[in-house]
Amino acid sequence: MSIVVKKWKELAEVKAELAARDWFFATSGNLSIKVTDDPLTFLVTASGKDKRKQTDEDFLLVDAAGKPAEETNLKPSAETLLHAEIYGRTNAGCVLHVHTVDNNLISELYAQNGEAVFSGQEIIKAFGIWEENAAVRIPIIDNYADIPTLAREFANYIHGDAGAVLIQNHGITVWGRTAFEAKKHLEAWEFLFRWQVKRLLLQRAGLPVG
């Protein structure tokens, strides 16, 4: 089995799991997985596809600039430049970007703070943080319609081989050293977003919550 086929299957499995959660509204979102380091190549979702379906045209191979590495009629997802920035600056092996109601709400509620902070939740251990009462922070950046501008702003928040950034009203982008790590971190962030949204609703209803 070639490395491209192996990575294709790995990314397809992640896509299927996220699709089962209904995290690909209206063809939104994009996923990628690194194939080679030198030269840098990675598989990324093709633009405009229904990601709830499995087809032979789900992904295409692109180079370090996010351009197709092989002849194809497919176009890479619009945010491929963000993936390229991550791979070019870290040892990440997988990047996942999804739009959910909860992550958009959190990005809107805390945009003025420039970040959202969560603490006191056991799920934080998913990030490898085991301290009692630990807190995690996720930066929130402005959403620029011009993707190169967005990529330049996004690049300021790429620190380490695993991380996450919220784009205001434009979803979350998570990366990890492996597809498993990226998916685990994405699931943990989405848990925290949903918990906070429900917590705020309960507080507004006057119910006693911490």
UniProtKB/Swiss-Prot annotation:
**EC number(s) recorded for this UniProt protein:** 4.2.1.109
Q: Which GO terms describe its cellular component?
A: cytoplasm
Pathways involved: Amino-acid biosynthesis; L-methionine biosynthesis via salvage pathway; L-methionine from S-methyl-5-thio-alpha-D-ribose 1-phosphate: step 2/6
Q: Does the keyword Amino-acid biosynthesis apply?
A: yes
Top EC class per UniProt? Answer: lyase
Keyword Metal-binding present in the record's keywords: the answer is: yes
**What Gene3D superfamilies would the database entry show?**
Class II aldolase/adducin N-terminal domain
Q: How is the cofactor bound?
A: Binds 1 zinc ion per subunit.
Instruction: State where Zn(2+) binds.
Output: 97, 99
Q: Which SMART domains match?
A: Aldolase_II
Family annotation (InterPro entries) = Aldolase_II/adducin_N (IPR001303), Aldolase_II/adducin_N_sf (IPR036409), MethylthioRu-1-P_deHdtase_MtnB (IPR017714)
Tell me how this protein assembles.
Answer: Homotetramer.
The protein's name in its UniProt record: Methylthioribulose-1-phosphate dehydratase
Lineage of the organism: Bacteria, Bacillati, Bacillota, Bacilli, Bacillales
Name the gene behind this protein.
mtnB
